[in-house]
């Protein structure tokens, strides 16, 4: 099946996403667009020289005209986070970049599904929804899908259990106000606290889980990686690839991605991550999972923090 995917931004994240796409079967055509023509041509040259080891695929360094009629568009453009910066620190600069990109790509690919990866991703998703004219159902922010993966990795390591058996999630902003709704955490249907009791009795683990330390690991991992190597891109690319897989599958999936809220948990007019139904038609809606009173308060606080930043921006 012919499927065109456009990646806007050929920085570390965009180039790695394009490379990951070139290894799979989600796309038959990949267009990579970047303001730095020499950089994008170099990235594409590096990618295409490895495509002889797979079934034929088209990968080009293009412009917005080449992105016409894309099935999926991934936006990664923006200034990258530096060590010690929060994602919110990037807001106005990257908002200005998004305001420039959105009308250009929307004009040539009005029917595409859009995956927003640029940080701060919840704000960038909101801005794209407000300035592009694209229906909200076609717009998905990568949100906390990576945070959820980091959480599951940490729990997998702690309990020596495959990540696919862990059902635990990160909600809220992809950033400092995110939280873990522990009331939802299970391992193969067993509440996490009960599973941990069993693991302690069997000496699989000796230390009890510290919820605050676990949340700190999830929230600070990105910053630690940036401090050590300058940027994060492998796990980000893997998480985006997971989203793309859901968008081309025969059935819908549920993932913690960012999309516009319309009264869920009492939250309006902000993009934030809760369990969201996504599939070939984009966003179908939010799964109305019951949260505790404290968890609902944390979600609303996260939404309010994002709204406060949005109110200060020139959108």
Where are the language model's segments positioned?
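Extreme N-terminal starter segment of soluble prokaryotic enzymes
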Residues: 2-5
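Glycine-rich Rossmann-fold phosphate-binding loop(s) that bind the pyrophosphate
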Residues: 10-11
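N-terminal Rossmann-fold NAD(P) dinucleotide-binding loop
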Residues: 14-15
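Conserved S-adenosyl-L-methionine
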Residues: 23-28, 133-135
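Conserved N-terminal Rossmann-fold NAD(P) cofactor-binding segment
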Residues: 29, 33-71, 85, 307-315
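Rossmann-like NAD(P)-binding element
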Residues: 52-112
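Rossmann-like NAD(P)(H) cofactor-binding subdomain of soluble oxidoreductases
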Residues: 86-153
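C-terminal substrate-binding/catalytic lobe of Rossmann-fold NAD(P)-dependent dehydrogenases
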Residues: 134-138, 148-315
């Amino acid at each position: 099946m012919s499927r065109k995917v456009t990646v806007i931004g050929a920085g570390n994240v965009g180039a790695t996403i394009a490379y990951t796409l070139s290894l799979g079967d989600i796309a038959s055509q990949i267009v990579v667009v970047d303001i730095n023509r020499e950089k994008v041509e170099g990235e594409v040259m590096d990618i295409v020289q490895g495509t002889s080891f797979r079934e034929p695929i088209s990968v080009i360094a293009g412009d917005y005209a080449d992105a016409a009629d894309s099935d999926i568009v991934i936006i990664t453009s923006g200034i990258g986070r530096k060590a010690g910066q929060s994602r919110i620190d990037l807001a106005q600069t990257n908002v200005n970049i998004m305001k420039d990109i959105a009308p250009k790509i929307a004009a040539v690919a009005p029917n595409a599904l859009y995956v927003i990866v640029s940080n701060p991703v919840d704000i960038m998703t909101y801005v794209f929804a407000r300035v592009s004219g694209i229906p909200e159902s076609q717009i998905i922010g990568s949100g906390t899908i990576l945070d959820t993966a980091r959480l599951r990795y940490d729990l997998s390591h702690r309990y020596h259990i495959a990540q696919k058996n862990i059902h635990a999630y990160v909600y809220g902003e992809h950033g400092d106000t995110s939280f873990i709704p522990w009331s939802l955490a299970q391992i193969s249907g067993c509440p996490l606290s009960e599973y941990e009791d069993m693991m302690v009795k069997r000496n699989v683990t000796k230390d009890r889980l510290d919820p605050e330390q676990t949340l700190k690991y999830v929230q600070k991992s990105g910053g630690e990686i940036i401090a050590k190597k300058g940027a994060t891109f492998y796990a980000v690319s893997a998480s985006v690839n997971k989203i793309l897989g859901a968008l081309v599958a025969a059935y819908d999936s549920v993932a913690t991605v960012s999309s516009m809220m319309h009264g869920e948990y009492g939250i309006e007019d902000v993009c934030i991550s809760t369990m969201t139904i996504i599939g070939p038609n984009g966003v179908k809606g939010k799964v109305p999972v019951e949260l505790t009173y404290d968890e609902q308060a944390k979600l609303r606080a996260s939404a309010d923090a994002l709204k406060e930043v949005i109110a200060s921006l020139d959108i």
